[in-house]
A protein has these predicted regions:
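C-terminal catalytic domain of Rieske-type non-heme iron oxygenases
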Residues: 1-172
Length: 172
């Protein structure tokens, strides 16, 4: 639409407020991009990735995150179909070979916090302390979707910080 009736902030209706200070403070850059065409329908992909039962499919999530705070999370709905999930502290050190990731958290983000924002109709943003990822899904047909995954780091990252951020991103 060349003449949108809403700004981005109006359209997102506050769904990004939970991570705004972490992602707006420093300039970011993409360090990872992957796309894939999946033989599934859009609704199935969206629902599978936005429901809480999704976490049960990931061994890593079951080991590092299933604590009282995890189960107290809430899906917080916003106008225009957007949702964010309240945060909890991920216990990375509970996963064999992992360690605490709090030292490299995004700006203004408490150590090892995890947030997820779903923007309807097809965008997902995950901020896991040191690693920020966005996924977009585009329907290509009734049973085919294009998924694009991006990983972000802070532009000011040192080479060592960037390597750690990439390792954290790739491990989830």
């Amino acid at each position: 639409d060349p003449n949108p009736s809403q700004s981005i902030d109006e359209w997102t209706c506050g769904a990004f407020d939970c991570i705004a200070e972490a992602i707006d403070t420093e300039e970011m850059e993409v360090f990872h991009y992957h796309k894939s065409i999946i033989d599934t329908n859009y609704k199935l992909w969206h629902d599978t990735n936005s429901e809480f039962y999704h976490d049960f499919m990931h061994y890593h999530n079951r080991v590092t995150g299933f604590n009282d705070a995890y189960f107290a999370r809430k899906n917080i709905p916003f106008d225009n179909g957007h949702v964010n999930v309240s945060s909890f502290t991920v216990q990375y050190e509970e996963y064999e070979g992992f360690e605490d990731r709090g030292e490299l958290s995004f700006p203004n983000l408490p150590p090892n916090q995890w947030y997820m924002v779903d923007l309807f109709p097809g965008f997902n943003f995950n901020l896991r302390g040191s690693a920020y990822r966005s996924d977009s899904v585009t329907p290509l047909g009734p049973n085919k979707v294009l998924i694009e995954f991006r990983g972000y780091g802070l532009k000011k990252d040192t080479p060592e910080e960037r390597a750690t951020r990439i390792e954290h991103h790739n491990s989830i």
